[in-house]
Amino acid sequence: MNLSLINPFRLSHLTVPLWFFVFVPYKLGEALLITLLPLFIVQTVNGSVTDVGRVHSLTSLAGVIAFIVWGNLSDRLKLRRPFLILGFCGFALCTALTAIAQGIEQVMIFCTLGAFFMAAITPVASALVIDGNPEDRWASAFGRFYQISGWSFVGGVLLGASWLAFIPIHWTSMGLRSLLLLASCAATVSLILCWKWVKEPRKSSEHRHYQPELQDVISVAVIERRAMFYSSRMLYFILHPSWRVNLLHNLSRPLLLYYACAAVFFFAVNVVFVPFPIFLTTHLGATNTQVLLITMGKAAIEAFFYLPMARFVQKRKGVQLQAWATAIRVAVFLIFSLVAVMPVHPLSLPLVGMAHLLTGLTWAAISISSTTIVATLAPKGQEAIAMGSYNSLIGIATIIGSLVGGMMAVSYGYSACFITGAILMGVTATRLFWIGRMPNLILQKQGNPIK
C-alpha cells in the first residue's frame, strides 16, 4: 500500500510506501532518548559531564560495531523484517530499563545495549529502500525516507519540550523518566506497525553497488544530534572483507587529506556538543524545556534544508561549500566561548540559541557535501569502500571526542571545550579551502572536476 503526499520543496505529488511510516514512532522515541539523555544522566542519576561523555562514547562504539554486524548478517541471510523487529524490541526494552535506572552504571549498560540493537534498524531500512525500488528511483526514495525521518525527530523533541513545560519543577526527575518510558512505548508502536506493514521483499540484494546518483542525497544523517549519538548512518552498501586491502592500494593524497579534515571536524563537534546541554542548564540557567526548544530549532532547520541543500550541492563545489560552512562554525563556537567566560546576562541564552541555529544550517551543507566529496575523490570503482571507511572514521572520532569533551568540561570548564572546538574548526576550514584549490588534475576523476 502506498500513500500520495505532496513534497513541500517541489510541490509535486509523491507516492510513499506505507512502511516508511513504520519508523515515525521509533524516530519520535529516538529523539526523546538522544536529547534527554545528557539531562537525565546529570539531573536524575546524579552523573557528571564526564559520565555524559562516557555514555556517548560507549553508544557510538556499540553503534560502529553493531552496524557492520547487523548489515552483513541481514544481507547474508537475505532477511529484513526480523532485524527490524529485533531493533525495535531492543530499543524499547533498553530505553524502558534506562528510564528506571538508579545509577550511572546501569544507564551505561542499558544505553550501550540499546545502541547495539538500534544499529540493526539503520542498515536494514536502507536495504529495504533498495530492495523495494528500481535503481533509477533510489535517490528519490532515500530522499523521501530521510525527510520523514528528520521531521519525525523534530516532532519527538517538540513532544518532549511540551511535556516538560507543563510539569512542575519539583517533578523534573519524574518527568524525564516518564518521557523515556514514552520513547519506549513509541518504539513498541513501531514494532506493531512493522509486524503489520513490513513484508519481506521479493528480491534481496546481497551485494550493494555504488550508484553516482545517490552521492548528492545520502548524508551522514539529517539530524546532527543523531549522528553524534551513534555512528551507524544510512548507508546503501555493506563493506566486504577485502575493503581494507583495496583501500590501501588506492588511497589518493586528496582523499587522505579529506579524511584527516573529517576526523578533526567530528572530534571537535563532539568536544563542543557533548557537554553543551549541561552548559545551558548549569551555566546559563536554562530550563529543560528551553534546552529542548533550542535543540528542536536546530533540528527543524536541518530537516527543512536537507533536500534544498542536496540540490544546491549538485551545482556547487562540495569542498568550498563545506569549507565555508565549517568557517561559520568557528564564529559560532567563539560566541559560545565568549558567553562561557563572561558573566551571565539575560541575553546570554538567546544569543547562544540563535548561534546554535546557524550550526543547523551548516550541518545541512556539511552532511550532504561530505558524501559527494568522498565519492569524487575516491578512485574509480572504490567509491563504496571510500565512503565505508569515512563512516568508520566518523565513529572513531566520535568515540574519542565524546570522552575528551566530557573530561575537558569537568577539568577546565566549558570555555575550554568551545575554544578548542573553534581552533580545530579553524584548522579544518583552512585545510578544506586548500584542498579545494588543489590542481584540477588531482581533483579530477575521468575528466570530471569535483562538484
Annotate each language-model stretch with its function.
Residues 120-133, 365-378:
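Intracellular juxtamembrane helix-capping segments at the cytosolic ends
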Residues 2-60, 64, 254-295:
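Helix-loop boundary and gating motifs at the non-cytosolic
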Residues 142-161, 391-401:
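Glycine-rich segments within core transmembrane alpha-helices of 12-TM secondary carriers
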Residues 54-72, 296-308:
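Central cavity-lining transmembrane alpha-helices of secondary-active solute carriers
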Residues 66-79, 164, 305-318, 409:
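Helix-to-loop junctions at the C-terminal end of transmembrane segments
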